Amino acid sequence: MLKGDPSEKTKKRYQARVDAVNALGARTKALSDDELRAKTEEFRERLRRGESEDDLLVEAFAVVREAADRVLGLRPFDVQLIGGMILHEGQIAEMRTGEGKTLVSALPAYLNALSGKGVHVVTVNDYLARRDAEWIGQIHKFLGMTCGLIQAGMAEEERRVGYGSDVTYVTNSELGFDYLRDNLAQNTGELVQRDFNFCIIDEVDSILIDEARTPLIISGVADKPSERYIQAAKIADAFEKDYHYKVDEKQKSVLLSEEGYEAAEDLLQVTDLYDPRTQWALYIINAIKAKELQKRDVNYIVRGQEIIIVDEFSGRTMQGRRWSDGLHQAVEAKEGVTIQNETVTIASVTYQAFFKSYPKLGGMTGTAETEITEFSNIYELEVAVVPTNRPVSREDSTDVVFRSETGKWNAVRKEISRMHKKGRPVLVGTTSVERSEQIAELLDEDGIPYELLNAKPENVERESEIVAQSGRKGAVTIATNMAGRGTDILLGGNAEFMARLRVRESLMQRVVMPEDGEIAFEKKGNLAKSGGNKWAVKEGLYPCELSAETAKMLGEAVDTACSVWGDRSLEALDAEERLSFACEKGPSEDEAILALRKVFNAIEAEYKVYTSAEKKEVLGLGGLHVVGTERHESRRVDNQLRGRSGRQGDPGSTRYFLSLEDNLFRIFGGDRIQALMSAFRVEDMPIESGMLTNSLDEAQKKVERYFYDIRKQLFDYDAVLNSQREKVYFERRRALTASREQLQEQMLEYAELTIDDIVNANIDTSEPVSEWPLEGLVGKLRQYCYYFGEIDESDIRPIAEKGGVNALRNFLVKKGQDAYMTKCGEVEATEAGLMMEAERFFILSQTDNLWKQHLQAIKFVQQAVGLRGYAQKDPLIEYKLEGFNLYTEMMAQIRRNVIYSVYMFQPQRLEQKEEAELVGAGGDQKPNSRKK
């Protein structure tokens, strides 16, 4: 170990507890399955008696380690125990690729779920959430805990069950959107989440840093004429860059020139492009952004009539996400697809704000060290580097830099060809769909077979299948950013994964119920290429044909499964979970599980003969070679790609091929790199220069600082809105879950505060009482509540003269609250429980409506305060002040509207079978109708 190695420091810190867990190994191993399972209830009882999770850590980790060995055949290494301890303490564990992060999460998840408050394990996509729930979830189930899974498209009840489990596997987006939907619920029956307790984020840097700039938004439709988007797209297409407009790629912004401004006005026949009534400027600017900054197969792909955003960090599609402020519609107009309506934000939250709402948060990643400052400053999370189980023996070569892209691509092509001829597996990392397909075309010309993994749907569906076989001899895999791919690249191929795919291929078509339209689909011949089996894998995936004996055993096992479970009777998720359990070692009495497990083991053994031999061969050749084709805007993402090679001490190598025309250096490189481009004229000759290497590193650091500053600014501004959001959602939830007495207490409070507002607005206490406009005050109170009709100025002037404003206020508050109680009695006489339903409806509808308006208003404030920097004012301070004023006015408006609606509420008895409506000033919605 090097002196000062952070992983050595981590090891020393936790070694005593690791030794204590190891010391319990023999005793834990001697326990029967039932005795091991009984430990869970013993731990829960000890927590109830006052012990803490820290007190139980050593014993709980020993139990999970033993359960993992029995169920999965995997025994966590010492370094994995250290990772689990780091997560339990609410920190980030940096663990190299291939060191078993997924298994690590089982340790703190079990320990923190013992309290009964639930643990969320968050992954970046549905596939990984399902895989981890099916795989690691077996440990929790074996130990007597419930394990939940949340997937896109699940119904409310399924989500409620999932979140109610001891350990819940879920994606970051599903978790965030469920939080927002819960805070739009109209009754408690719509709530799916419970209070947050402990969260473990896998690929924590991807979620908390890469996605920090993208808020989660629930929108409602707002009408906007699509013709304007089409007109603007035509104008943008006709305009010339650097004449009609300038593009700032660094800021991702465009600016109309004087010529562009005049030309747009002439073409549109308007006198002012910035007229707020038409807002043509916004349409034109968005159309130019769509043309210049949003590139097809880089920033998005087109699928049918839909524009689907591609995540620039992970290379995955972001189904259902849309750019805001009309940009998505501008891209739709550019591509000639159906333009969807503009939207208005109803609820939103950033990941920065959302994940800080957990009492305890931990995370895992292979690359966090470069972002230590950000994790500490924004999330108050420390990063601990976990030592590797075996020393890293990967060789990272120096970057090869060319003047132009042509030279770079020729060199990449030669490098792939050279490695392929040797028989070494090659992983080529690209930054976009477009680039990955460009390399694929070059390899087609050279006759080199390859697998392509990018955001296009036909490739995404085979993702795990492709990645799991990327380590086979001579394999070439082209992939957009490898962040969060979740499947390890095993040298020689993954026999276990292939065996599972082989069983799955035969089993699923027999036990999974047909989907709607599947029969018709099959009749059209769309499944002919896979023999009518949509579960079939690509031809040539398996290393050998099954022996006759094993093939027969597979057929019999599938027949047994059909007999026991029913023919085509299972949901796909249920079948996947049963298959996952069959491919592990957990105890079972299910005849079908045991039959499938037996054949799975037989297939794996046959495949392993070939993969083990191939692994030795690939190791001898030097292992996996990674080719990078562009530096990312973060060193961390580059390191993620490098980390795919050399897992668990295997040999491997990496090399980046760059060009001075790459976006990173072109946009952020500065004068030095421009000077180098002028100095070097040869296209195909690599540039070697110490100054160049330093300049490239400096450019990348500059980008990292630039985007960190953006995220920090976003966090600072969002902290203002988040504080308001928490208070609004607290008040809303208070009304949603309140008992009759609690709701009545809330209404009395609203009445008191509203009368305070009216008194303060009408009385200037600096003037003598004789000057107070009490007649106007009484008039205002009568408008607000007709029960004040019995009071006039002569009733309140003596009170004011004798006791001042406080006495006047107390008198009026008492009258207002008495009026409320009178109204309650009248409404309850009409129908028992109706008042409570009406009050709840008024609070929820007013809160939702005014919060929606507030989000729009505060968005405009944020845009406007940016200009105040020119007036030597701090935009953030200005935003806080104006935001606070808007917030206090909104809260007062909610209270006023609600209590006014209650006072004016006039329920009527209607004949049987006719619906009774609640009529008030409570917004557009109507509460559940009732029959009398």
Swiss-Prot record:
Residues annotated as binding ATP: 95-102
Residues spanning the membrane: none
Annotated localization: Plastid, Chloroplast stroma; Plastid, Chloroplast thylakoid membrane
Main location: plastid
Signal peptide segment: none
Cross-referenced Pfam families: P-loop_SecA, SecA_DEAD, SecA_PP_bind, SecA_SW
Keyword Cell membrane: no
One Gene Ontology term from the biological process aspect of the record: chloroplast organization
Reaction catalysed by this enzyme: ATP + H2O + chloroplast-proteinSide 1 = ADP + phosphate + chloroplast-proteinSide 2
UniProt-annotated stretches for the region Disordered: 632-653
Protein name in UniProt: Protein translocase subunit SecA, chloroplastic
